[in-house]
Amino acid sequence: YSIQAVFAETRFAEVDAPFLPEENTSGFEAHRKYHRQRTDANNRMLASLPDQRVTPDDFGRHRLGRKWKLLFNWSADRYRPIAFSVYNGPGNVRRRVASRLRKPSQQARSKSRPNRTSILDGGDVFSAGEPVRPDVLSATGLAATIPVSFDGRRTSLANWIIHPANPLTARVIVNRIWQGHFGRGLATNPNNLGATGQPPTHPLLLDWLAMEFVRRGWSIKSLHRLILTSAAYRRSSSHPHPDTVSRLDPNGTGYAVFRPRRLAAEELRDAMLAVSGELNPQAGGLPVRPDMNLEAALQPRMIMGTFAPSYVPDPLPAQRNRRTIYALKLRGHRDPFLTTFNQPGPDASCERRETSNVTPQVFALFNGQESSDRALGLAARVLKTADSDSDAIHLA
């Protein structure tokens, strides 16, 4: 509850934020023009219709149309220089659900006072108990002074988090990055690093990496370079004396050999696009809508109390074939191809990616539409590059 009190007076706001020169804004003007054309066409169609009384049967359709109009307007906001931000202070009353989240005036902020944060008896939000001050975790042994005023709470917490004496922050980050490269962390419970989780297999290595990470200015890139150039990462997947390795390391927690890992779902899709020559390596920009299984794309889903529009991929291959990291994430609408290869769900924190070898993966690679499209792309690339049939066979 002390940590919760730090964020108790933090509110959301949509503030003006002009695009930076290095941001990817390609296609913005074309999308704005497309939205204007659709809006104008819809308005002309509505203006041409005769006035009619709304019958009870039409009421539901009108309600659905209004909600789809709200969704359309929200999608157009993606091309406006607006940033989803936060501020400290009183909340601002919204006149409509679709209205923009604006910060209150400075005068309104100066007249308000922070609300009291209390321990909720039994976890019930309507049973406020003993009041609690903003504070940090005492178990770390590192104290911090968090102000009770509106301003300064999150800044003080951030300074406590990145303090060199904080025993958690650097170790948690290092353990996560190590797990990304080796398939398992030095401590196998990344979400529960500490006394209640599994102890690290190599605690001295974890401590040294954490100190080195802080010493290098918290540089993630430098940490990646340090791990990838280490002898542990560059080891072979086989050992000249496997019996000795099995005897000395029966649980497989050591690093005498590098245990290969399967490509993650996103890496697999990107690799298939790269081999076929269809991958668009452009960085940044808006989320894209890749191709998806037709049956999954047409699957009904609910949003805002009514049915959502069907999933429609982006019209251009250059948009659809971006890297998977730029794909739009919809919690209720997941790509079956990526899910088959253990892509974690977006509705919960993923402690560790599970790896499975199941029959649907074989069918997805042999018979799936994704594989078929990539095979056609590879064939087109080979035929375009090769001068003869023998060259085409060699390239393939």
Question: PLM ranges: what are they?
Answer:
Residues 1-19:
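C-terminal, active-site-flanking charged/polar segments
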Residues 23-321, 338, 344, 348-359, ...:
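Primarily short, surface-exposed interaction patches in extracytoplasmic proteins
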Residues 330, 334, 342-343:
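Short Ser/Thr-interspersed hydrophobic loop/turn segments at strand-loop and sheet-helix junctions
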Residues 7, 279, 329-331, 369:
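A broadly conserved detector of short glycine/acidic/proline-rich loop/turn motifs that flank catalytic sites
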